[in-house]
């Protein structure tokens, strides 16, 4: 029951979505500043320097990562620096452009981004998107995304022709607003995972008044922020039907599984599956032994 880290910074996007109303503007003058911010963050990760990591990482991301590690009953910051996945070097990648809205920015690259792949492993060409937030006038690294292009000949042709209009797609846009800062968590009695089926709905799940996540028209598992404790726990589920959806008949189902540690068997401690239309908001208590 161990959840991947890489700072919560690596998100793999399988396909391009060009339907997006672009609000950020190109700003090539930021490229050197952003690359310097990324290299400083990367150096902190390589050397295991927690002070430098705190100085180079957006604060909202710091808190999210620390909470995620502690929620798994793992030591912080040791677990952060033990992550086996490396952050890629920018050398050898082709810069495609920088987008900024003033408080958030992205810098996108094309090429064979190496995340510590074993020697001899073939690395395909992909798009690497670095995300940054501006705090107190200083750009801080937030996360990175790998956009897989596979054999998409159209994208490859656009890149060869220096047509980077696909950067208008949602995958390449900076954050539209600054993310909220989570409250810190303490080490829980048990690690917990939420299993969610939100087919045709937007579902928000709160466990012990902490947001586990917001899920729209998908089936997914997610680490419960703050875990669960022995004895009584509370869960709130908010469900909102989506105007258009695909993937089957609309339904909402939520289950919580808990385990003493990452190596232990997880047991279901809560299950919600309404027979009819789910209520807009329900709150239940559940006991963990």
Regions found by a protein language model. Give the residues of each.
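Beta-strand-rich recognition domains
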Residues: 29-32, 39-46, 58-62, 66, ...
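Short beta-strand segments within Ig-like beta-sandwich modules, predominantly Fibronectin type-III
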Residues: 211-217
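Short, flexible loop/turn segments at beta-strand junctions in immunoglobulin-like
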Residues: 224-228
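Hydrophobic, helix-prone linear segments
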Residues: 1-95
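Phosphoinositide-binding peripheral membrane targeting modules
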Residues: 221
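Surface-exposed, charged secondary-structure patches
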Residues: 74-129
